[in-house]
Amino acid sequence: VLTQRAPGRKCAILPHMEKMTERWERLLSPLRVKVEGEAVSFEDYRPRGDARSPFEVDYGRVVFSSAFRRLARKTQVHPFADVDYIHNRLTHSLEVASLCHTFAKEVQRIVRARGDVAPERIEAIDWSMQAAGLAHDIGNPAYGHSGEEAIQSWAEKTGARLGDDPVWNDFRVFDGNAQAFRLLARNDLRDSVYYCFTLASLGALVKHPRLASSFAAGAPGARKLAAFSTEEAIFRKVWDRLGLVRADGT
């Protein structure tokens, strides 16, 4: 709650507000992941002469990507649909981005009233959420969840002889969310389609903050992930930088 101020006096800032301001500053980080060999660091990369914010760049990278366009060929499951204009993953992603825009506007209204975010940083909330909404299904394989199960089944049979190799375990528990993080977080292999999102957009993207290494092969139950073993070091550094790690390290 903002304190009342007398005429001619500045508004007092409570310790709670200082903490929230610092937290938002971390959450709205414009930094991007930089991978060099085994080393993971961050850089404030901005295209020269680009008037857009780093978060608008995230949004644009998704819109103009081939992976995003391919979502038009991936349908959502609609058994016995009554109409012939059912959703595909592309139209669904556009709708999710629109919902994220709506939620972001409400968040902006609240933080603006509370004074939790510097005025010049408030727009970052909207763009990072829209970018995450637009890209949230970009890692989905063909046939969606059925495709995930097919990959898991193939890896379980094919990789059985390789034992506990972490990469094979990634395939055994394959999840489109983790594949999306892989595509959106990395900056290496320039000839590949890596988007190198800002940390703020990556934080908005993650729905299930669990790692593939925490699931044993063949374990029962739903296995929704944030990152594969190949991106575990990246995920941990991003999560720590955003201040999303609990006191117990989880």
Where do the PLM segments sit?
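Sequence-structural signature of the catalytic-core scaffold of metal-dependent phosphohydrolases
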Residues: M17-A51, V63-K74, V83, L94, ...
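Short, positively charged and aromatic/hydrophobic N-terminal segments
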Residues: K10-H16
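Short glycine- and acidic-rich boundary segments immediately preceding or forming the N-terminal edge
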Residues: D82-N88
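Short terminal hydrophobic/aromatic SLiMs and anchors at protein ends
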Residues: L2-T3, L14
